[in-house]
Amino acid sequence: MATDSWALAVDEQEAAVKSMSSLQIKEEKVKADTNGVIKTSTTAEKTEEEEKEDRAAQSLLNKLIRSNLVDNTNQVEVLQRDPSSPLYSVKSFEELRLKPQLLQGVYAMGFNRPSKIQENALPMMLAEPPQNLIAQSQSGTGKTAAFVLAMLSRVEPADRYPQCLCLSPTYELALQTGKVIEQMGKFHPELKLAYAVRGNKLERGQKVSEQIVIGTPGTVLDWCSKLKFIDPKKIKVFVLDEADVMIATQGHQDQSIRIQRMLPRNCQMLLFSATFEDSVWKFAQKVVPDPNIIKLKREEETLDTIKQYYVLCNNREEKFQALCNLYGAITIAQAMIFCHTRKTASWLAAELSKEGHQVALLSGEMMVEQRAAVIERFREGKEKVLVTTNVCARGIDVEQVSVVINFDLPVDKDGNPDNETYLHRIGRTGRFGKRGLAVNMVDSKHSMNILNRIQEHFNKKIERLDTDDLDEIEKIAN
């Protein structure tokens, strides 16, 4: 299946989609009537479990819809544990001196040269003696294949006991990584993989003979300590994948730390996360001693190729009218429209359909595979407008989006501007050197305040646009 790695056959993708139908997205619990005006109640806040499932499901969705590697323009920043040691990067897999069966496996996956993150990460991960690594890496950058390569490089196939341990936040994400291991290791028939996930029962007293174990923290901890199916002292490589998803569940964080403490001192520790908020950093530093660090440089996240505007309105009907005026005046190839709640998203999609637009709706209650199908249709241009809530659209890349509309401005759970989400939303439009257009709908003093704070944060002026003035709208399209 397409993990965040290589172009694989479409039928494999479809098979994986079918196998994933059990994972559902939880309903957004935070409601807002107008931009950023949030009403919470004791029952309206997301539980940690729901938040984690949102992130885990989002990550899974990215894997299902990813057909190739993302061309990441961010500069990679490398912080070495030992600054005096030479810094290597590679431009080909041959330079890594892999075992022939492993190189064969890499090429069989359709991978011809390392991605940007792999160029820097692989020499560190394959170094002798082994080095620890904390890496920031988005979906689609080839990090799964990178750590699978590291695990397969260190395994002794003749030794029939677990030597590599990989933690994933959910059963479904563990399966995705497992598929990459099976594909890359297919010319190593003696290499075996075990899944340490709930429901996979072994007899008491039994020992795991597979060399690689991938699983969720709770089950892996049981297998290592209580049930003693695995001897943690023999583990050579420990991978903690999707750390930001993992720590959204308190239990997973504690379990991961307990597993790490059972491992030998010379075990190689590799941790990956798409984001590095403070909580992720603290966790990473607890589980990965003396690490090399690979980060994406923040200043690369530029808004220079995107023209940003705001429109003043009094209510959602006026916002809708402004939207119609935009559509009437300029040619929009494809647009993404973000709403704060599912209710608003559903209403807006229905209104746009009545106006004759081909509209796709990404909604929180959809199964992951349904959402993957909606995104594919939008990618193929079958629908020209995608209306979505924030929860659904994190991390989804569609190259031909020319306009992003914030029907509601992004705010965090406390009602403050969510700058990272703003950047992420509008960053979909100014890609690959093209000019993009972002339009923000403002309908209250509060949302004007949010907009002003977003301007200050990015140090970029957002111009006012009068959508009743056709000449003015036509100017912004040029």
Curated annotation (Swiss-Prot):
EC number: 3.6.4.13
Spans annotated as Disordered: 34-53
Top EC group: hydrolase
Region (N-terminal helix): 54-67
Keywords annotated in UniProt: Acetylation, ATP-binding, Cytoplasm, Helicase, Hydrolase, Isopeptide bond, Nucleotide-binding, Nucleus, Phosphoprotein, RNA-binding, Ubl conjugation
GO molecular function terms attached to this record: ATP binding; ATP hydrolysis activity; RNA binding; RNA helicase activity
Full protein name: ATP-dependent RNA helicase DDX19A
Originating organism: Mus musculus (Mouse)
Lineage, top ranks: Eukaryota, Metazoa, Chordata, Craniata, Vertebrata
Gene transcribed to yield this protein: Ddx19a
